[in-house]
Regions:
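TRAFAC-class small GTPase G-domain
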Residues: 1-176
Length: 176
């Protein structure tokens, strides 16, 4: 009896574990967002070389978040992180219209890979405080509608302050 009760208890009250990749072009704000999620504060960051790994608890999940560098020379390495990924957070600098088509191209490469076909996609339109593009503008530029079978949602966020991140992560946790 004790084992059954323990099993039921852990099923409903223990946290599920999930691997999440945080990807996007360099200078999109991935590491700033990661530390805002982890610590609830803005830390001064430097460009990521390789990856940053953090464990974050959100809702009923223990998330293993891999923030992978977005520089041109390092993007081909992204695919080596895909295995067992349950969620993808793709961060876009909404103030950088010049690189929006490049961001779209990289996102479509990711979404075209079978290893992440079942992963939920959280598209973060970062730097909303600069008021250049709306989250819907970013979503349209990323042509997310081409992936109709993909669980995805776009949120406008401000990585420096954390604005919008709780709602975005709630959606991700509910859809993984």
């Amino acid at each position: 009896m004790g084992n059954k009760l323990s099993s039921v208890w852990s099923k409903f009250f223990s946290k599920k574990e999930a691997k999440v990749l945080m990807l996007g072009l360099d200078a999109a704000g991935k590491t700033t967002i990661l530390y805002q999620l982890k610590l609830g504060m803005n830390l001064e960051t430097i460009p990521t070389m390789g990856f940053v790994y953090e464990k974050i608890e959100h809702k009923n999940f223990k998330l293993s978040v891999w923030d992978v560098a977005g520089q041109d020379a390092l993007r081909p390495l992204w695919k080596h992180y895909y295995q067992n990924t349950k969620g993808i957070i793709f961060v876009v600098d909404s103030s950088d219209e010049k690189r929006m088509s490049l961001a779209k191209e990289e996102l479509h490469k990711i979404l075209g890979d079978d290893e992440v076909k079942d992963a939920a996609l959280l598209l973060l339109a970062n730097k909303m405080d600069l008021k250049v593009m709306t989250p819907k503008d970013v979503e349209n530029k990323m042509e997310i509608d081409k992936f109709q079978n993909k669980k995805s949602k776009t949120f406008g966020v401000v990585g420096l302050t954390g604005e919008g991140l709780t709602e975005a992560m709630d959606w991700l946790a509910d859809n993984m």
